[in-house]
């Protein structure tokens, strides 16, 4: 499960792609308004897109609607988990992982979270206490986490390393820095 931005969705897609190649049934849980609905091009066994959104930029009304929206989202995910009986639920962050992680715990399904960032996101910080295992893209970013790196889709593994790609090149390299769909404060501050 992952939602919202590419930083959560693309690592989840990489793991889903890998598990599909290993003949696992892969179920996808995402949000109705996130990027995942547009980029989910992999054939998964079943999908559930829930109506649940972050509240940080939704003002007082968003906070007032949160309890009801959370309960409804958890209920929908519990139904999905009971019907599909997954062996494990893996969360990659984003707002939809909160009801998904709570539902996994209620259904006694092991929850594993993966934090891709050097500064953990709110969803993963909340779900860490419910998780059986915490996987990290960067070392020492969450207590009790295990550093495994960030998953990449197979399309990236076929790209030759820079030493081979640029061995014939002369002159300076031009570098494009991309900060992600929500921006990256460190890049904005430095540049």
Where are these regions (language model features)?
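Short amphipathic alpha-helix
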Residues: 8-19
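An aromatic- and histidine-rich active-site surface loop
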Residues: 34-38, 86-107
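Donor-nucleotide binding loops and adjacent catalytic segments primarily
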Residues: 34, 39-43, 161-191
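An amphipathic, basic-hydrophobic alpha-helix
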Residues: 59-88, 106
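Conserved nucleotide-sugar phosphate-binding/catalytic loop shared by glycosyltransferases and other
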Residues: 1-3, 20-69, 179
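Active-site-proximal region of nucleotide-activated glycan assembly enzymes
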Residues: 25, 46, 105-162
